[in-house]
């Protein structure tokens, strides 16, 4: 098979294979390969070349960038997880497999259909593959100060980075505020005051924050997770368990649907790993309206057989 490899050389720690190392493994598996660094200005032009597989070596950021450019095309995306959280890879069951095992398994891998969300708001219209949210997680990420970012940058171990972000989240749970949100999800009125809202296409958000364990990225539905002020203790306990490497879920209510409308005031929004407004930009307007829909099975991903 002909493989186009999009490689993020900055992803993960120092022990990750180089792009050339991965190409060598692809050749050993009997495939041809074209290597493209995601750091090149026009890296995405490589996606226009004929290929049987688009392989992505990196984290959720570059996986999302590639996926959004492959919407509606029938070429499967094969993830080689090398990032910090690897939320999409974890949902697909490929995170803990070795890079060579994944590559040698491509010929027998399952082709998994994958939905794409679409978020319309003051920013225009943006597709997403992980989710959209506001509240606790988004506020924490938008308020990371220079000291926090320096601390994370100096951690070469991905597990240490995850733990550090989980600790930052936990430290903000007790002081977080609830926000009034007018929410319509299909024909249901879910309006109320919430500390967290996440409309999810996969199981995880941010630092492997597993909010929607039943999420199926190919069912044509979003999993909407909302948490009230009274549910802070559940979230705090879940984060503590994750920091201690215990398997647990926060047990928040999950609603399923495919058309979400949110009206709120002055909140920062994350769409996958992008923030709106961007850090340093003017504060969001007093009132915003967000419409979220789903395009069912717009992508194909490879998963273990």
Predicted regions and their residues:
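Short Gly/Thr/Asp-enriched flexible loops that form oxyanion-binding sites at enzyme active sites
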Residues: 62-73
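Glycine-rich phosphate/pyrophosphate-binding beta-alpha loops
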Residues: 133, 137, 198-212, 275
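Short N-terminal binding/cap micro-motifs at the start of the first secondary-structure element
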Residues: 12-16, 206-207, 299-301
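ATP/NTP phosphate-donor binding region
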Residues: 1-57, 64, 99-107
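Short conserved active-site loop signatures built around small residues
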Residues: 60, 197
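Catalytic core of DAGKc-family lipid kinases
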Residues: 6, 29, 34-36, 74-76, ...
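ATP/nucleoside-binding phosphotransfer catalytic cores, i.e., glycine-rich phosphate-binding loops
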Residues: 185-186, 191, 210-211, 216-305
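Short glycine-/acidic-enriched loop or helix-start segments at secondary-structure transitions
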Residues: 15-16, 65-67, 89-90, 139, ...
């Amino acid at each position: 098979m002909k493989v186009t490899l999009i490689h993020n050389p900055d992803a993960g720690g120092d022990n990750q294979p180089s792009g050339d190392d991965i190409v060598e493994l692809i050749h050993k598996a009997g495939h041809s390969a074209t290597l493209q660094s995601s750091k090149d200005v026009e890296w995405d032009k490589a996606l226009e070349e004929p290929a049987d597989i688009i392989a992505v070596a990196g984290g959720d950021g570059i996986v999302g960038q590639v996926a959004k450019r492959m919407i509606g095309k029938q070429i499967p995306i094969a993830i080689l997880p090398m990032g910090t959280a690897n939320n999409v890879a974890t949902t697909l069951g490929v995170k803990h497999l070795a890079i060579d095992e994944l590559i040698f398994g491509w010929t027998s891998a399952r082709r998994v259909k994958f939905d794409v969300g679409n978020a319309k708001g003051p920013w225009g219209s943006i597709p997403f593959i992980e989710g959209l949210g506001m509240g606790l997680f988004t506020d924490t990420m938008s308020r990371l100060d220079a000291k926090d970012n320096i601390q994370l940058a100096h951690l070469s171990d991905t597990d240490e980075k995850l733990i550090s972000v989980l600790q930052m989240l936990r430290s903000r749970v007790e002081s977080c505020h609830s926000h009034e949100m007018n929410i319509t999800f299909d024909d249901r009125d879910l309006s109320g005051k919430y500390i967290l809202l996440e409309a999810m296409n996969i199981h995880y958000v941010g630092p492997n924050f597993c909010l929607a364990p039943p999420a199926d990225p190919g069912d044509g539905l979003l999993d909407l997770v909302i948490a009230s002020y009274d549910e802070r203790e559940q979230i705090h306990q879940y984060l503590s368990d994750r920091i201690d490497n215990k398997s647990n879920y926060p047990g928040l209510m999950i609603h399923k649907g495919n058309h979400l409308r949110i009206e709120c005031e002055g909140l920062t929004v994350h769409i996958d790993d992008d923030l709106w407004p961007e850090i340093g930009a003017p504060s969001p307007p007093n009132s915003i309206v967000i419409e979220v829909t789903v395009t069912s099975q717009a992508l194909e991903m490879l998963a273990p057989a």
